[in-house]
């Protein structure tokens, strides 16, 4: 799986790259990310909106628990933006190496939740354009309107309403902090 040629990599969709990075990494993972103050602040803001969704019967859990077990799924892309220090960014073959390096061990971490199918939604990174350009979509903000838009993006998957955990990564590119997140659930419970 690690031997993907440049042309094949550049034709992958964002979802395919995530799936490939989950399946293709046998190496050890990076050290676990310790939540920053920004991550804790953001999850508090997200949970205010999430609770409203719960009361309205739109999600299964009253709040999301900050759990960085799935952070590699988004950090691998955040690191691409940080290393090239630009957004938007046209994906290159060297970006694939960053994605693989940063997502190593993700599949193993997700096994206890039922595997990669436990991932339920993501927000903060665009799907690649036809020219393979991706962008960080959401500048960091705990302001109510921005958080509501972000939560709506997280809920843009058929399994999103089942989410009980959230992993957050806040990449910094050209001095601006962005927010990215992935939600997931425990399929084994």
Spans of features found by a protein language model:
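C-terminal motif of bacterial Sec signal peptides marking the signal peptidase cleavage site
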Residues: 23-24
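Short, polar/proline-rich extracytoplasmic segments that appear immediately after membrane translocation
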Residues: 3-5, 27-36
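N-terminal secretory signal peptides and thylakoid transit peptides that target proteins
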Residues: 1-20
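Alpha-helix boundary/capping residues
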Residues: 16, 77-81, 154-157
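Short, well-ordered surface patches within globular domains
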Residues: 32-109
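A well-ordered secondary-structure block
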Residues: 96-189
